[in-house]
Curated annotation (Swiss-Prot):
It is found in: Secreted; Target cell membrane. GO terms for cellular component: extracellular region; membrane; other organism cell membrane. Keywords: Amidation, Amphibian defense peptide, Antibiotic, Antimicrobial, Immunity, Innate immunity, Membrane, Secreted, Target cell membrane, Target membrane. Transmembrane segments: none annotated. Its main location: secreted. GO terms for biological process: defense response to bacterium; innate immune response. Expressed by the skin glands. Antimicrobial peptide. Has activity against the Gram-positive bacterium S.aureus (MIC=16 uM) and the Gram-negative bacterium E.coli (MIC=64 uM). Has a moderate hemolytic activity (LC(50)=50 uM). The modification Leucine amide is found at L14. It comes from Rana cascadae (Cascades frog). This is Temporin-1CSd. Belongs to the frog skin active peptide (FSAP) family. Temporin subfamily.
Length: 14
């Protein structure tokens, strides 16, 4: 899931 990966990356950055 691309969207899930994007959210996961955002959570790691934030």
């Amino acid at each position: 899931n691309f969207l899930g990966t994007l959210v996961n990356l955002a959570k790691k950055i934030l």
